[in-house]
């Protein structure tokens, strides 16, 4: 099989498959999940998917979401990293993270933060270190004018 890594918003045929992978780990209604996934865009936040291709069969097997970290130049936050349950232990998690790292580098980001509650050992094994929390407004960043964001993050 082949693996390909894609921005979800450029590949609308994978929205439902992506929602299923996320809902397997974090339950939400399908409509709520699709609503949030459809906010993925080039200017961030962006949902990225790992697709397994076996001939004509294509299946979403992994996901990550990247948002801008406010108040920290050239920094982004990676969250909602997940691999389909029946595909775990096959190196797909590492592949999602490696491809996500390459994606953010191409976009000009130099620092990548992530959030996790139960996978600290996995990320430590990949070379990540614990740090102080960072702030990302994710899909809501556009709701605040730049001057308010600047004031908020320079307090």
Model-derived regions, located:
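Short amphipathic alpha-helix that is part of the acyltransferase structural core
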Residues: 1-59, 154-155
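Long, hydrophobic N-terminal alpha-helical segment
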Residues: 35-44, 52, 68, 74-79, ...
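Conserved beta-strand in the GNAT
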Residues: 49, 57-69, 74-82
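Conserved residues at the C-terminal ends of beta-strands
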Residues: 67, 84, 115, 134
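Conserved hydrophobic beta-strand within the GNAT/NAT acetyltransferase core sheet
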Residues: 78, 112-115
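Conserved acetyl-CoA-binding loop-helix of GNAT-fold acetyltransferases
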Residues: 83, 89-102, 125
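Conserved active-site alpha-helix within GNAT-family acetyltransferase domains
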Residues: 105-110, 117-151, 155
